[in-house]
Amino acid sequence: MARTGWTSPIPLCVSLLLTCGFAEAGKLLVVPMDGSHWFTMQSVVEKLILRGHEVVVVMPEVSWQLGKSLNCTVKTYSTSYTLEDLDREFMDFADAQWKAQVRSLFSLFLSSSNGFFNLFFSHCRSLFNDRKLVEYLKESSFDAVFLDPFDACGLIVAKYFSLPSVVFARGIACHYLEEGAQCPAPLSYVPRILLGFSDAMTFKERVRNHIMHLEEHLFCQYFSKNALEIASEILQTPVTAYDLYSHTSIWLLRTDFVLDYPKPVMPNMIFIGGINCHQGKPLPMEFEAYINASGEHGIVVFSLGSMVSEIPEKKAMAIADALGKIPQTVLWRYTGTRPSNLANNTILVKWLPQNDLLGHPMTRAFITHAGSHGVYESICNGVPMVMMPLFGDQMDNAKRMETKGAGVTLNVLEMTSEDLENALKAVINDKSYKENIMRLSSLHKDRPVEPLDLAVFWVEFVMRHKGAPHLRPAAHDLTWYQYHSLDVIGFLLAVVLTVAFITFKCCAYGYRKCLGKKGRVKKAHKSKTH
């Protein structure tokens, strides 16, 4: 018998999905961050363009990657620095990581990174000095701003034009995420950045965690001083970091609880960890040939990210020596000077299709700096890691993966050739590392919505509703003592003390009355006996 109606929900779901595909077109302003930050943000922007939205990207004329191959309106503005200045400051910053690992905000403040960050911060002043561009943005009637908060310029733009904003970030430095979202972060089990602690901290680590929290309040204002001065100049009023971050409508955070430790979250914090992962593509013939030639031993993928172009000669030779002692073929993304002791099993390449190689069944291990992009590609493809973190959240990412048994962490500044060799043999030959990373991969992929689709939904949500005020906690409207209920505690303490005082006075009065009466009785009794 022919069916006269839909008895299955599948056609209805397909119909709804198709209907959702035709979103009501909006107008979005994008203020991105250069470098690797742009790679994943670009995927969201491209999908929003495909869904029919009018997207305008505002970027400096001097940049590495911004705005390339985008089918949308790109508005540029001149900067006070050249590409050579940018490259020089970045190289100084990158080279400094091979001298000492930054594990406190005080050492970061004293390091050479200040010049690099201040260069990035300065371009926002250039944006607002372009009066023609500012006038264009003012007249464009955008629905929202999609921004990377690293250099604060997107936050300044959102506040200047009074637009709802969607923040796109792995995490936020200092205490700005907790303050901006009014999200609690108990220091007893939520480790601060740079420390590389797990959520099961010893007493000594908890003490250090509290000290780091104090450091954030002491030194972050100095670290962000240049950005806040520019913001105050543009907005023509004194501005704090809280003033900028607290108006965020939605926080799109490139993490999840497969990588991160469980902790409190707020309703406007959306987790899109793994958004950079994608289905593996066929490998270029060159790399397919390398894999075929590797035989049964397979390959090891080695990349320290775009940040590292040169490794000190002595360290590079120690690494090359270790790589030559394993039977696998090593594909090493490296643009520096070729180590003189490079073994036949190690192939240097200037670029490699990292995600596609990690997705190949012959890949045995991944040597990485533990940047969030690489870590998630490793999780998605189920490849155990040897992690050599250098800076920022890399130490924290590495600790999280090591805690979960998915890899081994080495101190790249102190490790020897034997350390790297032993770590590689451990993650390749010990099946527990592969089993653990496959378990994490299964957990990560078991989700109702893909991270990219989730990110696109929330950007469109903010565009449709002009923000998300219903998700904004009332904590933003409280003073610090109200937030911590110090006024309530003080009131209740006063009540308890008042009651205790009155009770004490009543008891003392009764006691005196009783003693006085008893004394008179005794006195009367004595007089009668005489």
From Swiss-Prot:
Keywords of the record, alphabetical order, are: Endoplasmic reticulum, Glycoprotein, Glycosyltransferase, Lipid metabolism, Membrane, Signal, Transferase, Transmembrane, Transmembrane helix
**Its family?**
Belongs to the UDP-glycosyltransferase family.
Q: Report the main location listed first in the record.
A: endoplasmic reticulum
| Known catalytic reactions | glucuronate acceptor + UDP-alpha-D-glucuronate = acceptor beta-D-glucuronoside + UDP + H(+); 17beta-estradiol + UDP-alpha-D-glucuronate = 17beta-estradiol 3-O-(beta-D-glucuronate) + UDP + H(+); 17alpha-estradiol + UDP-alpha-D-glucuronate = 17alpha-estradiol 3-O-(beta-D-glucuronate) + UDP + H(+); estrone + UDP-alpha-D-glucuronate = estrone 3-O-(beta-D-glucuronate) + UDP + H(+)
Source species taxonomy: Eukaryota, Metazoa, Chordata, Craniata, Vertebrata
Query: What's the top EC group for this one?
Result: transferase
Q: What span is annotated as the signal peptide, if there is one?
A: 1-25
Where in or outside the cell is it found? Answer: Endoplasmic reticulum membrane
Biological process (GO) annotations held by this record are: coumarin metabolic process; fatty acid metabolic process; flavone metabolic process; flavonoid metabolic process; liver development; negative regulation of fatty acid metabolic process; negative regulation of steroid metabolic process; retinoic acid metabolic process
- Describe its membrane topology: Single-pass membrane protein
Q: What else is known?
A: UGT1A8 isoform is part of the UGT1A complex locus which displays alternative use of promoters, first exons and terminal exons. The locus is defined by 13 first exons, which are alternatively spliced to 3 other common exons and 2 alternative terminal exons 5. From the 27 possible mRNA isoforms, 9 produce functionally active polypeptides (UGT1A1, 1A3, 1A4, 1A5, 1A6, 1A7, 1A8, 1A9 and 1A10) called isoforms 1 (i1). Use of an alternative exon 5 (5b) as terminal exon is leading to 9 additional alternatively spliced products termed isoforms i2 and which lack transferase activity.
Q: What is this protein called?
A: UDP-glucuronosyltransferase 1A8
E.C. numbers = 2.4.1.17
User: Does Membrane show up as a keyword for this record?
Assistant: yes
What domain of life does the UniProt record list for this protein's source?
Answer: Eukaryota
Show the SUPFAM superfamilies listed in the entry.
Answer: UDP-Glycosyltransferase/glycogen phosphorylase (SSF53756)
Going by the UniProt annotation, this protein carries glycans at N71, N292, N344
List the Pfam families: UDPGT
Listed InterPro entries: UDP-glycosyltransferase, UDP_glucos_trans, UDP_glycos_trans_CS
Organism per entry: Homo sapiens (Human)
This entry's Gene Ontology molecular function terms read: enzyme binding; enzyme inhibitor activity; fatty acid binding; glucuronosyltransferase activity; protein heterodimerization activity; protein homodimerization activity; retinoic acid binding; steroid binding
Entry annotated with the keyword Lipid metabolism: yes
In terms of PANTHER family, this protein maps to: EG:EG0003.4 PROTEIN-RELATED, UDP GLUCURONOSYLTRANSFERASE FAMILY 1 MEMBER A1
Complex formation: Homodimer. Homooligomer. Interacts with UGT1A1, UGT1A3, UGT1A4, UGT1A6, UGT1A7, UGT1A9 and UGT1A10 to form heterodimers. Isoform 1 interacts with isoform 2/i2 suggesting that oligomerization is involved in negative regulation of transferase activity by isoform 2. Isoform 1 also interacts with respective i2 isoforms of UGT1A1, UGT1A3, UGT1A4, UGT1A6, UGT1A7, UGT1A9 and UGT1A10.
* CDD domains attached to this UniProt entry: GT1_Gtf-like
